[in-house]
Amino acid sequence: MAGTGSSRRTFIAGAGAAAAAGVALTGAGAAPAAAAGAGPAPGARRVVALGAGVAGLTAAHELAERGYAVTVYERRALGGKARSMDVPGSARGGRRPLPAEHGFRFIPGIYHNLPDTMRRIPFPGNAAGVWDNLVAPREMMFARAAGREDLRGPIPWPGHSPAGLTPEEIRRALAGILQTLLRLPPHETAYFVDRVLVFLTSCDERREEVWERTPWWDFVRAERMSNEYRRILAVGITRNIVATKAEEASTRTVGTLGEAFVFNVLGRGADGPPDRILDLPTNEAWIDPWEAHLRSLGVEFRIGWTVREVRYADGRVSGVGVEGPDGARQTVTADHYISALPVEHARRTWSAALRAADPMLGRCDRLETDWMTGIQFYLTERAELVHGHLNCIDSPWSLTAIQQAEHWPSRDFPADYGDGAAVDCLSVDISEWDKPGILYGKTAKQCTREEVAREVWAQLKASLNDTGRALLTDSTLHSWFLDPGVDGLGTPHPTNQDELLIHPVGTLYNRPTAGTRVPNFFLSGDYVAVDIDLATMEGANASARAAVNSLLDRDGSDAARCTVHPMYRAPELEAAKRHDRWRYRLGLRNVFDLG
């Protein structure tokens, strides 16, 4: 198996990165350089944003629009886990390098904050900016193994009048969808739909005090159901989608996500179809235009700089210790600081004095992360797969995937990328790194990079080639690329620079707010408490808006506050939730909860 994913890649770019100057280096209070377009006014308040993922870029965007001078510090590359990247050494004959990524992007219609930002990023020829680069796959598939028939179906999207939302109408609609897609025994389908109704009609207090403490496995009574029920509705929903074990995942988190998709499928409260992806590699469609727009607003970037410590003195953040590309350490100062690093990296930068100033920061140590990382397979022939996402729910490593070239209509894949031999990219997410595979009997972490690639390929074939048709063949495999954020595979100490926040029971109580007790320090990232309650790009975007609003309040600014769009609440169900609040306070079950 030819591999291009075994070498380590360091993402440090930009000729200006090696230059000195943060927002202000200690002893050198340089103002931000002028940028094309409307930059900050002389004497504008200065903000340092730590991290250039979706959270950091969103914060920079909102602040720059409000006249702040923003400098963003990023260790590797703009876009964080959302970015796409080049496969090193893969370009031939004037083509672009093969496109790769940490994991495929998924921007469902339940998102509202991120799409709003996308509409405000100009893109040539698009009236609605980057948002116009979203396309909707037509179908999805649960790919089964061991000869079981795959479950393939269209993605419901009414596109016209929304469905009714009385409990009985919801029951009928969901039962019909589940019976069509999943082929479970009717009594199990009916039971699961009733559990959905329990959650949909539960009051906020019950959700936060009971369902947050209840594992999803227990909530859906998986232990007493068939193996098919467990695989699809317990494990398949949690491990493959939110990278959390069903036996541990918070029902509030899983239920909140499920509720949003139920409303989306029924045509309620959505920005668009339930499944949307970008019509180009992520950097081409989104991150590169975003960078260009932010630079036009005067945002400055320091790429290749590592944040070492957020320092605290005299009741405020006094500066941030950073290390430049040359290894030299300096201190940058500003009026305000937004920490937009992933939680596992951010908490290492919080000094003891800073933690003492706000105990909420210490609770972030209890937040848990796990591995969910991508690998891409480049094919010399397009496989006859589903026209959308597929979920290999029987795969030991919880694989999900999508074949991408058909969704990029403005690109001729072999003419535009690589050496001309690869015609498509099958992008796969690996959500389970701690269970043995089918080839070597080892976990993904115990395998070498080459063994991971072979094992994932074998598991894909086990799910896709088991019903009489060979959809994937070894002869069509051109090469592969494994996310360079993982290192040390096959050694006693594997590492992952891009772990994902997971949601075991009780996670809600340890999520911080965007504003801290330190008046000039704010938090932004998918671990911050926002409405969606899930580690997503939407959560990162919403948290950045909340952080900016908190900063504006602390600054006494008269600038307009960012709109933070909440999750949709169906008006028809509010009466049921009020009734449930009354029952909950009396110590009674939800009216639909029959055990």
Where are these regions (language model features)?
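Glycine-rich FAD pyrophosphate-binding loop
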Residues: 64-88
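Active-site-proximal substrate-binding core of FAD-dependent oxidoreductases
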Residues: 552-594
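N-terminal secretory signal peptides and thylakoid transit peptides that target proteins
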Residues: 1-18
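C-terminal segments that line or cap access tunnels to active or ligand-binding sites in enzymes
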Residues: 267-278, 334-336, 341-511, 517-542, ...
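N-terminal Rossmann-like FAD-binding beta1-loop-alpha1 element of flavoenzymes
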Residues: 45-71
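Active-site/ligand-binding neighborhood in enzyme catalytic cores
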Residues: 188-313
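Dinucleotide-binding Rossmann-like beta1-alpha1 core, especially the glycine-rich loop
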Residues: 92-191
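Conserved beta-strand-loop-beta-strand element in the redox core of flavoprotein oxidoreductases
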Residues: 311-331
